[in-house]
Regions:
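Conserved alpha/beta-hydrolase
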Residues: 48-72
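The alpha/beta-hydrolase serine catalytic core
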Residues: 5, 124-233, 237-257
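The serine-hydrolase catalytic nucleophile loop
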Residues: 37-50, 214
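Catalytic nucleophile-loop/oxyanion-hole region of alpha/beta-hydrolase
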Residues: 68-94
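N-terminal cap/lid segment of alpha/beta-hydrolase-fold proteins
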Residues: 1-26, 242
Length: 258
């Protein structure tokens, strides 16, 4: 399939949700896109990745988390565990070695996906070819949300279950739920060593106001067993969607494809 979304069901019973997936058949290693919080698979970077795969005959997989884009479900029902489960289910539809490309929250999803994959199949059978993390935001619910909230906002979340956070990227507010925060604590990765068994490149804008560049530096201190390259882009923002940013991302991926 290519261009048209197909749907897979993730979860059972009341937890079942329809996840939209767009796959492009092609050679390996495949390119597996993991988007960010409130982003979808039709964003600038995701479409550039799809064009790159098309031009080089590579397999490309994109999908929307539940409550995002073309997928079913309500955004406010989303948690890190649910979205990670969906990423794993979509990954299981792919074949052969894959390059995981995770943007913002997608960077956290990529790390959780890799951990689950390695736990399931072991390092020798791993299909993780490489990883590109763009402004990665592991543990963001705790480190970049909860830690920065005022006592008033924290109390609002604990008492009402939700806080509406203005977004600098859209007119719609982000719904920050108590479930999102509490579930996030079950998925924290920055308190331990992370071993992926594949090369990792991190692209991070120094002018990023959503995920501070020091957050990416901190991530590297937990990836000491892998070949990790951190590229700081002095004038780059959080999105890293300018033509020169896209060019840099694709150049990195091209080097990984070989």
């Amino acid at each position: 399939m290519s261009g048209t979304a197909e749907r897979i069901t993730v979860g059972v019973g009341a937890a079942a949700r329809e996840i939209a997936v767009i796959g492009r058949a092609g050679a390996g290693p495949g390119l597996f896109w993991l988007g960010g919080f409130r982003s979808d698979m039709a964003g600038t970077k995701a479409l550039a990745l799809d064009d790159f795969g098309r031009d080089r005959g590579l397999a490309v997989t994109r999908f929307d988390y539940s409550g995002h884009g073309l997928s079913g479900g309500r955004f406010e029902d989303g948690t890190i565990s649910r979205w990670a489960e969906e990423a794993q289910a979509v990954f299981d539809t792919t074949e052969g070695p894959q390059i995981l490309i995770g943007s913002s929250m997608g960077g956290w999803m990529a790390l959780l996906l890799a951990r689950a994959h390695l736990a399931a199949v072991g390092r020798d059978a791993s299909r993780l070819h490489a990883m590109v993390l763009i402004a990665p935001a592991p543990d963001f619910t705790e480190e970049l949300m909860w830690a920065g909230f005022s006592d008033e906002i924290r109390r609002e979340i604990l008492e009402t279950g939700v806080h509406r956070e203005p977004s600098e990227y859209s007119d719609e507010s982000h719904l920050i739920t108590r479930a999102l925060i509490e579930d996030g604590r079950k998925n924290l990765v920055l308190g331990q060593e992370i071993e992926l068994g594949c090369p990792v490149v991190i692209l991070q804008g120094v002018m990023d106001t959503s995920v501070p560049w020091r957050h990416a530096v901190r991530l590297t201190t937990h990836l000491t067993r892998d070949d990790v390259t951190l590229s700081l882009i002095p004038d780059g923002d959080h999105r890293l969607s300018r033509p020169q940013d896209i060019e840099k991302m694709l150049k990195v991926i091209e080097g990984m494809v070989g």
